[in-house]
Regions:
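Mature catalytic domains of secreted/periplasmic carbohydrate-active enzymes
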Residues: 1-439
């Protein structure tokens, strides 16, 4: 990674944890945002449950009078999240701001207030970083894929321009999918505009997602590199350990039995705090971030279970955050047992599975000066030339996995250390994985 880009990304690399918010008129029906709309002018059949005429009228009843941007932003901040990515527009084409490019927007609902404006102001007010999710795919717009593609480019470039011009500092742009051919889009023009309007902004890997992998022609290497963006976005799963390519897993807090759960679905079951905390550690030890998704209700509030989950993270992060923030995954490569992070001479073992209160790992090339479990009990540590062994001293009950801090003596950089066959395979696969591939 070039030094200048490394500096632009450092805040994100250090942050580890963000809040994803999917919200719009679909919450009125309690259906999946975008995907439950029947017509998809694209080759993915989707869920397709709700007739267009019904879905496209949800906005006439969208009146989230209990929406409080400050309350949501503060809940994220108190949970230890450092940035928020909000759905400005999803695949259904509805804009959560007062866009001049379309009448299908929040200004024409009973609510009328500019949700993006209120959210952006709250994020800036409380010191977090702001990201916009923007779906280039638009199943409402008459020119998307089936009409005048030049007009569609003008439309979506215009909306992106508004998002990057009218809301102050924007730190991240999170595109989501587009189909068609390379000739259908003006990607160079788009990226030039993005970086001119918001120097230093980060862009994910989905600006041209699904153009890759189709019979759409082959772009020149410079264009392919441009649209690859700054980081990958494994969806609904934990990314693999990658040495040289940043990534961020996006995962829902609440999931219905039939999948999805990005937006509010009343039947969805919220994951346990222990599962979410483990997921965060699994991402960070793999050198990734976690973007944990919430879907507000039609009232504008988060469902109580999701708000409770955010509240549970607060005290946990106060105790365990030092093993996450501003660290780098490694040197131990993730295995079934857990993974590791390191910052300077402090190495943190995120232990998901103890074997009768013990853990054995390959030896480190540095002396271990001290060993303690964060928020827990004393840990006996012994290291010889072949093995590092840890043993818990008691039978303390734990609500979540353990994070054990090792204080190391000064020494040379520690190389990556495979801990089992599976972790070695994951590292090899990560080097071959197409960062534009489908997640």
């Amino acid at each position: 990674m070039a030094m200048e880009r490394q500096m632009d990304m450092q805040w994100w690399l250090d942050s580890k944890f963000g809040l994803f918010i999917h919200w719009g008129p679909s919450s009125v029906g309690g259906v999946e945002i975008g995907w439950d709309r029947r017509s998809h002018p694209y080759d993915h059949p989707g869920r397709a449950r709700i007739p267009d005429a019904e879905y496209d009228q949800y906005y006439t009843r969208f009146n989230p009078v209990e929406f409080d941007a400050d309350a949501i932003v503060l809940a994220a901040k108190q949970a230890g999240m450092k940035y928020i990515v909000f759905t400005s527009k999803h695949h259904d084409g509805f804009a959560n701001w007062h866009t001049q490019m379309s009448d299908y927007n929040i200004a024409n609902t009973p609510f009328k207030r500019d949700i993006c404006r209120e959210l952006a102001d709250a994020v800036h007010r409380h010191g977090l970083k702001l990201g916009w999710y923007y779906s280039t795919r638009d199943w409402y717009h008459p020119d998307y894929l089936v009409g005048d593609n030049s007009k569609y480019n003008d439309f979506y470039h215009g909306q992106v321009r508004e998002l990057l011009s009218n809301f102050g500092k924007v730190d991240l742009l999170w595109f989501d999918h587009v189909a068609g051919t390379w000739a259908d889009y003006r990607f160079r023009e788009l990226f030039e505009m993005i970086h001119k309007l918001q120097p230093g902004i980060l862009v994910n890997n989905r600006a041209a997602r699904f153009v890759f992998g189709h019979k759409a022609g082959t772009p020149d290497p410079e264009l392919a590199e441009l649209v690859k963006g700054d980081f990958d976005t494994p969806e609904g799963k934990i990314g693999v350990f990658m040495k040289d390519r940043p990534w961020e897993s996006c995962i829902v807090m609440s999931r219905p039995a039939d999948g999805g759960g990005w937006s509010y679905r009343p039947e969805a079951i919220t994951r346990s705090f222990a599962e979410c905390a483990k997921t965060l550690s699994a991402c960070v030890t793999g050198r990734g971030n976690l973007l944990l998704n919430a879907g507000p209700m039609s009232t504008g509030q988060l469902r109580p279970e999701e708000m409770g989950l955010l509240k549970a993270f607060g005290p946990w992060m106060q105790t365990f955050g030092e093993g996450l923030y501003e660290t780098q995954g490694g040197p131990y490569i993730n295995g079934e047992w857990g993974g590791a992070t390191i910052r300077g001479n402090d190495l943190y073992l995120h232990v998901f599975e103890w074997q009768n209160g013990a853990l054995a790992l390959p030896a480190l090339p540095r002396e271990v000066l001290a060993c303690t479990e964060l928020g827990g009990e004393d840990v006996a540590c012994r290291q010889d030339s072949n093995e590092l062994s840890l043993t818990l001293s008691g039978e303390k009950n734990r609500d979540t996995h353990s994070i054990v801090k090792l204080s190391l003596a000064d020494g040379t950089d520690i190389p990556l250390i495979p801990t089992d066959v599976a972790s070695t395979a994951r590292e090899q696969v990560s080097a071959l994985e197409d960062p534009m591939g489908d997640n």
